[in-house]
Structure formats: structure tokens, C-alpha cells
From Swiss-Prot:
Reaction equation(s) it catalyzes: an [RNA] containing cytidine + H2O = an [RNA]-3'-cytidine-3'-phosphate + a 5'-hydroxy-ribonucleotide-3'-[RNA]; an [RNA] containing uridine + H2O = an [RNA]-3'-uridine-3'-phosphate + a 5'-hydroxy-ribonucleotide-3'-[RNA]
Gene Ontology annotations for the cellular component aspect, listed alphabetically: extracellular region
Identification of the protein by name: Ribonuclease pancreatic
Active site: 11 (proton acceptor), 117 (proton donor)
Tissue expression pattern: Pancreas.
Subcellular location(s) per record: Secreted
Main location: secreted
Domain of life from the UniProt record: Eukaryota
Keywords from the named record: Disulfide bond, Endonuclease, Hydrolase, Lyase, Nuclease, Secreted
PROSITE patterns the record matches: RNASE_PANCREATIC
Assembly mode: Monomer. Interacts with and forms tight 1:1 complexes with RNH1. Dimerization of two such complexes may occur. Interaction with RNH1 inhibits this protein.
Homology family: Belongs to the pancreatic ribonuclease family.
PANTHER family, sorted: RIBONUCLEASE, RIBONUCLEASE PANCREATIC
Amino acid sequence: ETAAEKFQRQHMDTEHSTASSSNYCNLMMKAREMTSDRCKPVNTFIHEPKSVVDAVCXQENVTCKNGQTNCYKSNSRLSITNCRQTGASXYPNCQYETSNLQKQIIVACEGQYVPVHFDAYV
């Protein structure tokens, strides 16, 4: 799995325009293999066409959380869902809180149009 493929698996959900129910994160985190060996504590899904997310790589250049300079912030707010593990849940029964948001996203890119890491939303 390449970094770009991993980004697609962990962060892209183009089929849904928003999280359909409060159970969305529980289902999606499992379906996208983020609970197979541990519970990934936090993850964000983006409900926009791939072309829209790829285009962020040519928008505002910002510094990533880790200090690298290959992060880019979207010009507009995008439809995203944030999944956060609930305090009471433990592997293998990972449980998540689902939050629907409209936020600008920050992604790290390789080359001109290849998002490889979700850094933050603002």
C-alpha cells in the first residue's frame, strides 16, 4: 500500500456527502481497517470528490504539525467527519464518537496532486 493509497483508504469517503448516522465512525473505522490490530484514536473522513482533495495540494502552503513544509490548506470549507475513540472503549471493541463538520483541511502532499497525510482541520 503506497502512502497515497493509505490516504484514500483512511480519509476519503466520496460515496457519502456526510456521516449518515451516529454509528458511521464505528462502521467506517472497521471497514477501512483502522481497528484491525488496535483502535486508531482519531481519524477524519473527507466527503468530497477526489479531484477537490487532490487540488488542495496546489492551494495555500503551510507548515505541518511535525515541522515539515509540504502541507497545504484548502481554500474553502469541506464536508468532513471526525471520528474520536470514546474513553470507555478498548480494543477489539473500538467505539467512536461521530462529528459532522464543515472545515478547511490541511494535508501533506507528495508532488503536485498527491495527498499522502491528513494533518489537521481548521
